[in-house]
Amino acid sequence: MVDGKEVYISFNRWEDTIRHSFVSHLSAEFQRKGVSVFASEDSASDDRFAEESDAAIAKARVSVVIFSENFASSKGCLNEFLKVSKCRRSKGLVVVPVFYGLTNSIVKKHCLELKKMYPDDKVDEWRNALWDIADLRGGHVSSHKRSDSELVEKIVADVRQKLDRRGRIGVYSRLTKIEYLLCKQPGCIIRSLGIWGMAGIGKTTLARAAYDQLSRDFEASCFIEDFDREFQEKGFFGLLEKQLGVNPQVTRLSILLKTLRSKRILLVLDDVRKPLGATSFLCEFDWLGPGSLIIVTSQDKQVLVQCQVNEIYKVQGLNKHESLQLFSRCAFGKDVPDQNLLELSMKFVDYANGNPLALSICGKNLKGKTPLDMKSVVLELKRHLSDKIFVKLKSSYDALSVSEKEIFLDIVFTFRGANVDNVMQSLAGCGFFPRVGIEALVDKSFVTVSENRVQVNNLIYDVGLKIINDQSDEIGMCYRFVDASNSQSLIEHKEIRESEQGYEDVKAINLDTSNLPFKGHIAFQHMYNLRYLTIYSSINPTKDPDLFLPGDPQFLPPELRLLHWTCYPLHSFPQNFGFQYLVELNMPCSKLKKLWGGTKNLEVLKRITLSCSVQLLNVDELQYSPNIEKIDLKGCLELQSFPDTGQLQHLRIVDLSTCKKIKSFPKVPPSIRKLHLQGTGIRDLSSLNHSSESQRLTRKLENVSSSNQDHRKQVLKLKDSSHLGSLPDIVIFESLEVLDFSGCSELEDIQGFPQNLKRLYLAKTAIKEVPSSLCHHISKLVKLDMENCERLRDLPMGMSNMKYLAVLKLSGCSNLENIKELPRNLKELYLAGTAVKEFPSTLLETLSEVVLLDLENCKKLQGLPTGMSKLEFLVMLKLSGCSKLEIIVDLPLNLIELYLAGTAIRELPPSIGDLALLDTLDLKNCNRLRHLPMEMHNLNPLKVLDLSNCSELEVFTSSLPKVRELRPAPTVMLLRSKLPFCFFIFYEHRVTLSLYKARLQYIPEEIRWMPSLKTLDLSRNGFTEVPVSIKDFSKLLSLRLRYCENLRSLPQLPRSLQLLNAHGCSSLQLITPDFKQLPRYYTFSNCFGLPSHMVSEVLANAPAIVECRKPQQGLENALACSFCLPSPTSRDSKLYLQPGSSTMIILNPKTRSTLVGFAILVEVSFSKDFHDTAGLGFRCVCRWNDKKGHAHKRDNIFHCWAPGEVVPKINDDHMFVFFDLKMHPSILFEGDVFGILADLVVFEIFPVNKQEMHVGDSCTITKCGVYVINDAAGSSSGNTMTPQCSSMDSLKLLDGKGKKRLRVNYAGLKQREKALFLYIACLLGGEKADLLAQFLASTDFVIESTLEDLAGRYLIDISSNGEVMMPPLQRNFSREIIHMLPASTKELVSMASGSPCNRNNDVFVSFHGKDFRKQFISDFLKKLVYKGIRICIGDKILSRSLINKVIKESSIAVVVFSENYASSSLCLLQLMEIMKCWEELGQVVMPIFYKVNPSDIRNQSGHFGKGFKKTCKKTINDERQRWSRALTDAASIAGECSLNWASDADMIEKVANDIRKKLISSKKLGKQIQRVDCDHDNPWETEFNKCIERFFQLPYDGNHDESLVSLTTEKVIDMKQTLKEIYQITKVKLKNNLVGRRHINNICFMHILYEKCEERSSFNPTSLHTLYDNGIPYQVYTKRKKHMSGEEKAPIGGCVGCFYMGQNQGITKAGGGRTMPTAYPAAPQANQGYNAGAQPYPPTAYAV
C-alpha cells in the first residue's frame, strides 16, 4: 500500500530524457521544500505498479501532469492522465499542467492522432481527459528564454501556494521572502535574521513556520517563546539545559568549544522586547558552528539592530483575499463566506487592515451568531475596540517614553494622514523633538510614513483614541482633546465663567460641524493652552458651520500652532490676535476680504492656505513672513495682485491657479520650486526678455519639482492660459525640462526651446508647424504632445535626430497629411483623427521599437504597408474608424490588442492565427467582413471578441476561437432569425454571452444548453418574449434586454438574478415578478407601456421583498432592492409624495417596535439633454433628535444603476424606488427604538454621480416620499407634513488621490520594463541618463520603456543634472524583487553591471552550451546559491584579462565537461588559466563529466575529440598543445561523472556538499585577517599586503584533531621569513604612531604571531592554526604592548576569544562574528595613528 503523498507527478516514465533530468530535479526541489512527492519513475508496467499509481493519485492533494514530446506514446501514461482527470472531477484533486518542450496546441494535435495510434482502445476517454487537463488555467510552459531550474522553481512555488491555501493563511508567500533573505547570506557563516512588525501581525506564527521548515537542515534547534521572561527566569545556562539539553555541570569554555561550535544550530528568539538580554545571550552563541541560523522577532526595529542581525524582514499585513479567508474560517468555519455575508465580512476585513490577531478575534466573536446579532457586533466594534485587541496593543504603548506617548497621541488626534514635514514643524513648535520621536514610533510600528505622510493603522488609531478617553478620565483632564462628541459643554454656551474648570487644559479641538448636536456660540477666551484648532464639515465642505463667533476680537487663543478653519465666517482676522507661535494657517473657502492688516510677528509661520476664498482682495501682509514656505491662493477670483516675495528665501510653493485677475508674472524668490499659473490672466511674457528678469526666472525654475516625484525637475506650466498670445525666447530658460502650454489657444509660435527640455505640451494651440529647432537642437526630448493642433499640416525633416523621443501625440491634427520621417526610438505613436492617406513602408524600420500605434478614425487611410510583422514589439494596434481601410497583408506577431471596428476589410490575413498573445479582437461594424479564417481556431482563448453588426459575416462556429466574452452577430444570412444549435454546444461553458444587436427574432429553447451563464446581453433584438426556461439558469446574475422594442412580456426570472435592465422596451406591458426573489437592480426606464399600479403593487409587497433580502444581506446595512420606471404619480393616486427633496415622517412607538426599514420614493425630472456618463444616484440624509435634544444623523448613497452599467438617455419624468435596510432601529437609533424626540424623522435627498458629487441642474427632484416597512403591519404611508428644511446645498466631496505603491507600479510594468528596472537596480550609482541609455543600447537588451516612464511610476529618479538615481526605498524594493527571482534570472540580472563576478568569489564555473545551461547548469548553480556559495559563471566573461583575474580570485574552479565543451575556444582559454592556478597556486579544481567519458577528455577522442579538432583548426600549434595538456591534466583529477549516477539531482547535491566542505576548510585561516586596500602612495603598505597574501597560501583541511597536511621545510621557512618581514616593515611605523586605523588590527595580529613563533624553538603550523582557532592569550598581546610602549601592565589571564577579563560589564558584537568587550575605548581615527600609551585596543582581526 502506498503512503499518501501531497504531490503526484505524472509523466511518461519510459521517456528517459526527462525522467533522469527534469523530473528528478522537480522531485528533489519538492523534497527540499518539505513537500512529500510521488513520482512514477519505475519503468515497470505491471499491474502492481498500476495499482500503486492509482492509490497514490487518489491520496494526493495536487497532481503535476507533465506533457512531454512523447507523452502519447505510452498507454500507461494516457491511463494515468485519465485517472488524474477523474479524480479532479470526483474528489477535487488540484491539477497543475506542465508543457515541457511543446505547447497546448501541439497537445491537442496529438489528441486528434490518438485514433490512428490506438484504433481499438478507449481513445475518446483519453482525448477528453487530455483536453480537460490541457485547458486548465495556470499551466506552466517551458521556453528557450528560461532555464529548467527557473521552470522548476515556478512549479514548486505554485504547488506550495495551492497546498498552503488549506494550511496557515498567508504564510507561504512570506516564507518565500524569508528564504531569499537567508540565501543572501553565505552558508558558511553564522546567519541571522530579524522579523519585525506590529503586535498581532503574525511574527510568532511566521517564525514558527520558518522553524518547522528549516529545522530539519540543522543538527540541533530550539524555539524560545517569550524570550525576555524565559531569559530572566532561567538565565543563559538554564535555557541551554532546557532547549538544547546541555549539561550545566560542564564548564562554560568546554561547552562553547566542544558542544556548540561543532554543530549547526537553528535558534529562534521570539518576542524580544529588551535588547540587553538578547545581545548577552547571542554573544555566547557567537561560538556556534558555521552555517548556524539565528532568528529574532520583535516589535521594535531598534532591538533587532542592537542584536546585530544581518537582515530584517518587516511583516506586512495580510492582503484582502487572505484576510477574508482567515476571517471567514474563524467566523464561519470555511474559507469563503456566503454571498449574503460577504459585505459584512469585508467591513471587518477593512477594519482589521490585514492584522491576523484582529481578524481572528473578530471572527471568533461572530461564530455561531445570527445575522441580527452580527449587526450588534459591528456597532460595538465601531464604538468600542475589542478588549482583547486593546490589551495586546496597549502593552506596547506602555513601553513608550513620555515624549513618545505625547507625540503619538497628538498624531492620532490631529495629524493622522498629514504631511510628515508639516507635522514635525508643528510638533517642534510645541517643544518636542519630532524627528527622533516619529522615527522611534516608526521603529516600534505605531506609525508609518508613506508617500511623505504620517499614517496610523486603524487598530492603532482606535487604541490611541481609547487611551485618550481613558487617560482623560484618570487624570481628570476630560477636555484635553475635544471633538464633536464632547464639545457641547465647552462651546454651546454664549458665556463661560472663569471659575469653570478644565478650559485651560484643552490642548486640541477637532470639530466636524456636520456632526455637531447643537447650534451655539464658540469662544476660546480661557483656553490658554489650545495648540491645535480644526473646524470643518465632512458632508459639505463649502457650507458655513453652525457656529456663531462672539464680538470679542481676542477670541482666538494665543498659543495656537495649527489653525484649520474651513469656511471661516468673518471678513478679517482680529487685530489683537497674535501670530507669534502659529506654524500653519489653513482657511479654504473662507469669507476673508483681507488679512490681519499691518505688520505681525510671523517668523514661525510656514504655510498658509486661503484657496477658494472668492472675496479675498489683498494679501500684501504675506511679504512680512520671512520663513514662509507655501502660499496657496488657488481660486481666489477677486485677487488682483501678488506681493513682491523676492526676499522670502524659504518660499518653495506658490499656487495662483485660476486667479483670473492676476495679469502680470509674479515676483518670487530664486528658491521657488513649484509655481502654478494655470488659468491666470497673464497675457504676455515678452517683457521677460529684457533686463535681468529672464535670468531671475531661470534661477527661480532651477529647483522646481514635480508634485508627485522626489527628484528635482524644472517645470513651467501655463496650461489653459487662453489669453497668452506671445512668448519670449524660451531658449533663455536653460534649465527647463517640462514646458506646458496646452490649451493656450492664441499661441501661434515659440521662438526657441531650452536644450534640456524633456517634455513639451502644445495641445490645442494655434501652432502651424513644428519648429525646426525642436528637431536639431533638443536632443533630450522624451515626449511631444501636439494633439488637436488643427492648423498643423506636416512634420519637419530631421525628426530622426530626436533619438530619445518615446511618445509622439498628433491625434486630432485634422490637417496633417504627410509623415515623411519619424524618430527611431518611438514607443508610442498617436495619429488618430489625422488626414494621413498612407503609411510609408520606409517608416517600418524607424518604428522597430514601437509598442502602441494609434490610427483610429483616419478616414483617408487606405492601407498598411507590407512588413508589419517586423514590428515585433507592437502590442496594441488601433485602426477602428478607418473607413477606407480594405486590406491588411500581415500583422505583428506579438499583438495583444487589435481594434478594427468600422473598417472596410473583407477578410483577415491568415497570419492572425499565429498571434499567440492576442487577447482582444474588435471587429464590430465591419459590414464587409464575410468570413473568418480557419486559422483563428488555433488562437489561445481570447478575453474579448466583438463581432457586433458584422452584417455580411457568413462563418460562425467553425473558425471561432474560445473566448471569455463573446459579442457576436448571427452569421449565416438565412439564420439571422435564430441562432444555430451548434452555437450553444460550442459555448456551453461560457460565463458571459453578448448577443447585442444580433437581429434575433426569437430565442430558441436550446439556450438551456448554456447553464453556466452569469451574464447575458440580448439587447437590441426583435424577439417578443423570453423563453420560460430562463428561470432554470441558476447562476445567472445579470440580464440585459435594452431596446428590445418588440418585447411584450417577461416570464418568471431566475432566483439568482441581481440585475435586470429593460431600458427602452417600449412595448413591455406584462411582467411576472416573484416578489420574494426580485433582482437587486430593476430598470424599466423609458418603458412607457407598464401599468400605472406597478409601484403600488411593489410597495404592497415591500415586507416580502425586504424579508427575502435580509438573509442575503447578512446585516441590515445595504440596499435591498431598487426600481426605476416612468413616473406613475399622475396615474396612480395611491402614492403619497411630498413636493421638493425633503420630507418628514412620524414614527409612533408601535411602528418603531416593528420597524424593518424604509421604502424611499424619488420622482425626478430630467432635462432634454440629460446623459450623465458619470452615473446617477441619490444621497439620503436622515436626521433626528434624541430625548436629550442632541441631534443625530445617518446617510446612505443609493445608486440608480448597478456598477458598470451604461447610463441611458431618459425621456420624461421617472420614479426611483429604493428599499433600504440601513435605517434599521438598532443602527439608526443605536439600539434604542424609543429614544426619538417627538417621533419625528427628517429625510433630505440630493442627486449625485458615482463619485458622490452633485450632478448639477440636469436632473431635479420634484417629489419624494418615505414609506415605513414593518414586520407584521405591512407598509404604512409616510406622513405628509410640510418639511422643516428644503434640500441641502450641493454636495461636494473631495476625490482623494489614491496611494501610489511601488509594488502596484512594478506589477503594472511589462516584462521587459521589469527587466529594465532590475538592470538599473544592479547598474546604478549615479550614472548619467544618456550614458545609461548608451550602455543598454550596446547590449542585446531591448528597452521596452524609457527612463522617463519609469520615473513617472516613481521607480527611479532623474536628478537635475541628468543622473539616474534610485532612492533607498526603491532600492530596497528592487533588492527584494531580485532576491525573490529564480536563481537563473538573478544571475542574468547580476551580469548587467558589466563585471559578471563579484570580487573574491567562492567558485568559478566553466562550461559550454546554451541548451545545456538551461538544464543541468541552471540546477547546479541554483543549488550552490542555496548553499550560500558565491559563484561566477565563465560563459559571460569575454575579456581574457578579466578571465585571469576572476579565476585567481576564486577559491575553487569547477569545470563541467560536456560533449561540446571543446567546441568553444573561450572554454579552453578558461581551462588553461584554471590549470595554471592549480599548478602554481594550489587552487582546488573539481571536474564534472556530464554525459561524457573522462577518457574522451584525456585523449581528445570520440565526439568530444571532433569538436576539439574543429576548434584547433583556427589556432596555432603551440596553443593547441597547451589546450591538449590542460584537458589531459584536468581529466586526470578525480571528479564526478553523470554516467555513474541515476539522477542528476543526487549528483548535484553531492558536488555542492563537497564544495561547501572545502570552502569551510579553506576559510578557517583566511577569516582571521581583514583584508585592507592599500594606499599606493605608501610603498610599505603595498609590501605589507603582499606579505600577508603570501603568508596565507598555507593549505589547511579544517581538521582540529589531526595535524595539517604535510608541509615542506622550505614552506615553513618561508612562512617564518614572511612573518619577520612583516614585523620589520611595521615595527617603526607602529612605534612612531604612523599607522592608520585601518591597518592596526592586521599589524597587531601579525606581531603577536611573530612573537609567538620567536618564543618557540621550532615553528609548528598545527599549533599556529590552533592559535587562530582558539584565540591568542591576552597576556601575549599585553606583553607586546609593554615591549612597544615601555608601560608596565598586569597580565590578564584567559583567552581573548572568550573574554575572561575583569572589565566585561557589557559585551557587544564585533563585525559579524566574534565578540569584544565594550569596556575598550574607541579605536583611533585614521589620521591619529596608534597611541602606544593608551589602554589596549583589541584587534578586530579576530572578528570573523
Swiss-Prot record:
Gene3D superfamilies: Helical domain of apoptotic protease-activating factors, P-loop containing nucleotide triphosphate hydrolases, Ribonuclease Inhibitor, Toll/interleukin-1 receptor homology (TIR) domain
Residue intervals of the TIR domain: 3-163, 1399-1559
Domain remarks in the Swiss-Prot or TrEMBL record: The TIR domain mediates NAD(+) hydrolase (NADase) activity. Self-association of TIR domains is required for NADase activity.
Residue stretches of each LRR repeat: 503-526, 557-581, 583-602, 603-626, 648-669, 670-692, 710-733, 734-754, 755-777, 779-802, 804-823, 824-846, 848-871, 892-915, 917-939, 941-963, 987-1010, 1011-1035, 1037-1059, 1062-1086
Family: Belongs to the disease resistance TIR-NB-LRR family.
Entry-linked InterPro entries: Apaf_helical, Disease_R_plants, Leu-rich_rpt_3, LRR_dom_sf, NB-ARC, P-loop_NTPase, TIR_dom, Toll_tir_struct_dom_sf
Record's keyword annotation contains Chloroplast: no
Name the UniProt record assigns to this protein: Probable disease resistance protein At4g19520
Pfam name, any one: WHD_ROQ1
Domain NB-ARC as annotated: residue spans: 192-411
Catalyses which reaction(s): NAD(+) + H2O = ADP-D-ribose + nicotinamide + H(+)
Coiled-coil stretches noted in the UniProt entry, renumbered to this chain: none
EC number: 3.2.2.6
Organism domain of life: Eukaryota
A GO biological-process term: defense response
Alphabetical UniProt keywords: ATP-binding, Hydrolase, Leucine-rich repeat, NAD, Nucleotide-binding, Plant defense, Repeat
Residues at the catalytic site: E80
Gene Ontology molecular-function annotations: ADP binding; ATP binding; NAD+ nucleosidase activity, cyclic ADP-ribose generating
Function of the molecule: Probable disease resistance protein.
